[in-house]
Amino acid sequence: MLEGAKSIGAGAATIASAGAAIGIGNVFSSLIHSVARNPSLAKQSFGYAILGFALTEAIASFAPMMAFLISSVFRSVSRVTI
């Protein structure tokens, strides 16, 4: 039962990567729209888009880290109690 809960928790933690992919798509979609509306601010908009991409990707990097922590912590706890 604990193994099943561990797998469900790790899977739920990695679903966040789908949300990050949607967020990155929104960042660059907004960049394309802003450059189409005002081409003179393309350089500044690109800098903001790269910052948004980096912050979104940083959040996405927490998902595999949490999945790893969930699987390793539950593995060590189950060994101690048995």
Curated annotation (Swiss-Prot):
The record marks E57 as: Reversibly protonated during proton transport. This is ATP synthase subunit 9, mitochondrial. This protein is one of the chains of the nonenzymatic membrane component (F0) of mitochondrial ATPase. It comes from the Eukaryota. F-type ATPases have 2 components, CF(1) - the catalytic core - and CF(0) - the membrane proton channel. CF(1) has five subunits: alpha(3), beta(3), gamma(1), delta(1), epsilon(1). CF(0) has three main subunits: a, b and c. InterPro entries: ATP_synth_F0_csu, ATP_synth_F0_csu_DDCD_BS, ATP_synth_F0_csu_sf, ATPase_proteolipid_c-like_dom, F/V-ATP_Csub_sf. One of its GO terms (biological process) is proton motive force-driven ATP synthesis. The keyword Protein biosynthesis does not apply.
